[in-house]
């Protein structure tokens, strides 16, 4: 398993295809053209034929982040990861539980699949964690899971950019830190609670930024993507 961190902004911006149909996803990709090279596919699109669409994106020389947030018994995780590795996608998420991560890392060994451990969803805050039965606050739990992901040999983690600086200090320079909840200045937060602008996220130590609604929901999607890329390039590599 390798972790490819891009200096070029176009390789660090991941557009979330959070749309209901393959036809709409195809339209987004067509409109964005060569401006975007990396796409995230999650549950909504997976259940509408998104796995085949992921393969078509790979065939078109695009990179794919398959956001499945896997969590199961070790053997089931391993068998699933083995098949995902054969698809040619670049990234796959699973929840950052030590046994699951160790099984996934072993299953992906020898492939180019970058495994990402999901720490705490960016839609959750401390009150949500307490309601779910966790005694740790968000930052404490994120750092704990980030260290566990590093120890398990994962390629990176998914976390809010709010915690990115602390994570980078904890795990060093080589792990990918993939940050959802990215909102350009003036954008609506939507259902995200721990958000940051693209520039601030990169300054904090994020390696990849996941942006969905601010691009996919924009009247001019390509212009929105190019504006974010311009902001990212103005910062350079953190």
From Swiss-Prot:
Coiled-coil ranges from the UniProt annotation: none
What is an annotated GO biological process for this record, any one? 'de novo' pyrimidine nucleobase biosynthetic process
Q: Which residues bind substrate?
A: 18, 40, 67-76, 122, 183, 192, 213
List the record's Gene Ontology CC terms alphabetically. Answer: cytosol
Extract the InterPro entries matched here. Aldolase_TIM (IPR013785), OMPdecase (IPR014732), OMPdecase_AS (IPR018089), OMPdecase_bac (IPR047596), OMPdeCOase_dom (IPR001754), RibuloseP-bd_barrel (IPR011060)
Record-linked SUPFAM superfamilies: Ribulose-phoshate binding barrel
Pathway(s) per entry? Pyrimidine metabolism; UMP biosynthesis via de novo pathway; UMP from orotate: step 2/2
Cite the GO molecular-function annotations of the record. orotidine-5'-phosphate decarboxylase activity
Annotated catalysed reactions: orotidine 5'-phosphate + H(+) = UMP + CO2
Q: What is its EC number?
A: 4.1.1.23
Gene3D superfamilies in the cross-refs: Aldolase class I
Name the active site residues. 69 (proton donor)
Q: PROSITE patterns from the xrefs?
A: OMPDECASE
Q: What class of enzyme is it?
A: lyase
Q: Which UniProt keywords apply?
A: Decarboxylase, Lyase, Pyrimidine biosynthesis
Q: Which Pfam families match?
A: OMPdecase
Q: Which domain of life is it from?
A: Bacteria
Query: Which HAMAP family would you find in this protein's record?
Result: OMPdecase_type1_B
> Tell me, what does this protein do in biology?
Catalyzes the decarboxylation of orotidine 5'-monophosphate (OMP) to uridine 5'-monophosphate (UMP).
Q: What is known about its subunit structure?
A: Homodimer.
- Family (UniProt): Belongs to the OMP decarboxylase family. Type 1 subfamily.
Q: Which PANTHER family match?
A: OROTIDINE 5'-PHOSPHATE DECARBOXYLASE
Q: What is the designated name of this protein?
A: Orotidine 5'-phosphate decarboxylase
């Amino acid at each position: 398993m390798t972790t490819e961190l891009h200096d070029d902004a176009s390789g660090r911006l991941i557009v979330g295809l959070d749309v209901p149909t393959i036809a709409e996803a195809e339209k987004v990709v067509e409109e964005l053209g060569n401006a975007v090279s990396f796409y995230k596919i999650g549950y909504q699109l997976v259940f509408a034929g998104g796995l085949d669409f992921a393969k078509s994106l790979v065939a078109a020389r695009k990179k794919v982040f398959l956001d499945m947030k896997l969590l199961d018994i070790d053997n089931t995780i391993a068998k699933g990861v083995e098949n995902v590795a054969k698809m040619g996608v670049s990234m796959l998420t699973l929840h950052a539980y030590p046994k699951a991560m160790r099984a996934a890392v072993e299953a992906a060994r020898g492939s180019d699949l970058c495994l990402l451990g999901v720490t705490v969803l960016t839609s959750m805050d401390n009150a949500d964690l307490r309601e779910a039965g966790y005694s740790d606050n968000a930052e404490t739990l994120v750092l704990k899971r980030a260290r566990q992901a590093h120890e398990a040999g994962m390629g990176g983690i998914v976390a809010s950019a709010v915690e990115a600086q602390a994570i980078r200090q904890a795990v060093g320079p080589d792990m990918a830190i993939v940050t959802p909840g990215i909102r350009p200045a003036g954008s609506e937060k939507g259902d995200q609670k721990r958000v940051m602008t693209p520039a601030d996220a990169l300054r904090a130590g994020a390696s990849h930024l996941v942006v969905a609604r601010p691009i996919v929901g924009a009247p001019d999607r390509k212009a929105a993507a190019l504006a974010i890329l311009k902001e990212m390039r103005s910062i350079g590599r953190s």
